[in-house]
Amino acid sequence: MDYREAIAYILEIPKFTKKNSLEHTKDFLRILGNPEKGKKIIHVAGTNGKGSVCAYMQSLLLTEKKTVGFFTSPHLVKMNERIRIDGEEISDEMFLSTFDIVFAAVQKMKADGKPHPTFFEFLFAMAMTAFADSGVEYIILETGLGGR
């Protein structure tokens, strides 16, 4: 798939999935090799201001010369905005290579009779994979799946 086809695929996900359990998300990450393991994760929850708090945390960590992955939503212009490494959205090339890895894991899940990941789960897995591949020290997340 090329970049445009990958975006189209992701945008179609809500049409054929239902909300999955936290165990499903954990299983999905296991198939990907648990890319989140060994990272320091800052998980921000609350009613208002999550995006601002996450952006502030990212700035603080970058000021301290730490490497930071930041997964946020929604995007304004481009889906890449949701996945940032050291303050920059990932490139189209990195988006596509990460998509390919996650898409392959989805095919394995489907072959094993497991349900397709949701839109959120798919992008979350892409973010964790991109962060692992980039070797970030810290991951900043806005709450998803009810804070779990």
Task: Describe each model-derived feature in a short phrase.
Residues 1-46, 53-66, 71, 110-114:
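Short functional linear segments
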Residues 46-49, 142-144:
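Conserved phosphate-binding and hydrolysis motifs of nucleotide-dependent enzymes
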Residues 4, 19-22, 51, 89-92, ...:
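Electropositive phosphate-/nucleotide-binding environments in soluble metabolic enzymes
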Residues 34-37, 63-148:
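ATP-dependent carboxylate-amine ligase catalytic core
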Residues 48-50, 75-76:
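Short active-site-proximal "capping" loops at secondary-structure junctions
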